[in-house]
From Swiss-Prot:
EC number(s) on file: 1.3.1.98
Function: Cell wall formation.
Protein name, as recorded: UDP-N-acetylenolpyruvoylglucosamine reductase
Name of the encoding gene: murB
Localization per Swiss-Prot or TrEMBL: Cytoplasm
GO BP annotations listed: cell division; cell wall organization; peptidoglycan biosynthetic process; regulation of cell shape
Catalytic reaction annotation: UDP-N-acetyl-alpha-D-muramate + NADP(+) = UDP-N-acetyl-3-O-(1-carboxyvinyl)-alpha-D-glucosamine + NADPH + H(+)
Active site, renumbered: 168, 217 (proton donor), 287
Membership in a protein family: Belongs to the MurB family.
Length: 295
């Protein structure tokens, strides 16, 4: 019998996750949990005596939920984890804050260095987890430290060096939920910051399928190479499996054309990886997370 910890937040059983993802595909979460606050989250983790499997869920922008859904508990941090505040010449930002919202906040407060976030879908927590980056900047360039909680309910702090940022990854221990990030502040000019943000937005809209059901870059760039060039070289721009296709506009982006399943998307990605490897010997690494069970 499934026994759930007593919490102040909200549980939903057999909860459909499809509508929360940018791809609009996937199955249900066995249990969906939105904690009220950090103490509620801690209480849940401490009480999880059955060791129910745990997955965290952000903005749903860089993820494929498999069609068989997710066993155990999916935790989504809500608005109470999205605050932005100034403390001792640093920005303290909740992990569920959207990258775009932080970029706009920094522009309004003449803080430079965050312009690139306007072009990165998702949350601060997800950005830290994958060292998200674009247009010459990455999270590693602006982070001072993070606060997290492990699955045993212990609050932990990691400095930039301890996080061990790498290209689209880090060396953090597994089974962590990122709660806050501390950023350094560099003052700038609001108008110049806005100009740079507009440049980034214009570049995105002209080169990426941002109005489609997509999940951002599908594959990380191999060292010294561009994934899209390798994909284009094997003629897979626009290639389709089921309801999923590689974008005609940017062939490192997968698109749900309206009737794709998670299997269509994952099969398409694996097919692209196979063809690129056969042609160039390069193993493309997924940048999009795939979680859950196959049907």
């Amino acid at each position: 019998m499934l026994i759930l910890p007593i919490v102040k937040g909200e549980y939903k059983k057999d909860y459909n996750l499809k509508h929360l993802t940018w791809f609009k595909v996937g199955g249900n979460a066995e249990i969906f949990f939105k904690p009220l606050d950090r103490e509620d989250l801690k209480s849940f983790l401490i009480q999880n005596k059955q060791k129910l499997p745990i997955k965290t869920f952000g903005a749903g922008s860089n993820i494929i939920i498999r069609d068989g859904g997710i066993e155990g508990v999916v935790i989504k941090l809500g608005q109470n984890f999205s605050n932005i505040e100034f403390i001792d010449n640093h920005l303290i930002v909740g992990s569920s804050c959207l990258n775009y919202n932080l970029a706009k906040f920094c522009q309004a407060n003449a803080i430079s260095g965050f312009e690139f976030l306007v072009g990165i879908p998702g949350t601060i927590g997800g950005g830290v987890a994958m060292n998200a980056g674009a247009y010459g900047s990455e999270f590693k360039d602006i982070i001072v430290q993070i606060e997290a909680i492990d699955f045993a309910g212990n609050f932990l702090t990691f400095t930039n060096e301890e996080i061990g940022f790498k290209y689209r990854s880090n060396n953090l221990p597994k089974n962590l939920i990122i709660l806050k990030a501390v950023f350094k502040i560099n003052k700038g000019d609001s108008e110049n910051i806005l100009l740079r943000m507009n440049e980034i937005n214009n570049a995105r809209s002209s080169t990426q399928p941002i109005k489609e059901r997509t999940g951002g870059s599908t594959f990380a760039n191999p060292a010294g190479r561009k994934s899209w060039e390798l994909i284009d070289k094997v003629g897979l721009r626009g290639y389709r499996i089921g309801g999923a296709s590689m974008s005609e506009l940017h062939c490192n982006f997968m698109i749900n054309n309206g009737d794709a399943t998670a299997k269509d998307l994952e099969d398409l990605g694996d097919f692209v990886r196979q063809k690129v490897f056969e042609d160039s010997g390069v193993k493309l690494e997924w940048e999009i997370k795939r979680i859950g069970r196959h049907p």
